[in-house]
Amino acid sequence: MKTITQELLDGLKNADDIKAFLDLHEQDFLSQSLIDYLNELMSEKNVTVAQVAKNSGIGEYVYKIFNSERNAKRDTLVAISFGMHLTFEETQLLLRIAKFAILDSRDRRDGIIIYALMHGLSIFECDDLLNNDNLITLV
């Protein structure tokens, strides 16, 4: 069973031996590659790269990311999450695996993105909300 983040933090704080702690919790660390996770999600969601490209609003660039020809930026991954109809939690994990900051509800722009994800809005509807608030859009 996976250990929650707070339990890992508490364990690290109280650990006498970091090596023993790391060995004990090996299965709790994020080790999956971004591409592997994206492919896993595509399979789970039963979507194609073409559908993701269309629904994310970033078009052909998606193919370069899925073929490891380009590194995705944070906003690009968020756009892809809309294109794959990911949940908020799946999007957060996607950002963690890619080593990006997760969406933060205390940030106005991120708050709008979180709202859009939680309410099943499209990326275009999300961008309208961002634009109406004079914030940088995703696409």
Descriptions of predicted regions:
Residues 98-139:
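Helix-turn-helix/homeodomain-like alpha-helical modules used for DNA recognition
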Residues 48, 73, 85-90, 122:
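Helix N-cap / loop-to-helix initiation motif
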Residues 69-81:
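Short, basic-rich loop-to-helix N-cap that marks the start of a DNA-contacting helix
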Residues 14-48, 126-138:
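A short, Lys/Arg-rich alpha-helix, primarily the initiator
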Residues 48-55:
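Short alpha-helical "recognition helix" segments of helix-turn-helix
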Residues 56-72, 97-99:
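Recognition helix of helix-turn-helix/homeodomain-like DNA-binding domains
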Residues 42, 53, 81:
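The alpha-helix within a helix-turn-helix
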Residues 86-100:
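Short C-terminal boundary/hinge segments that cap the last helix of small helical domains
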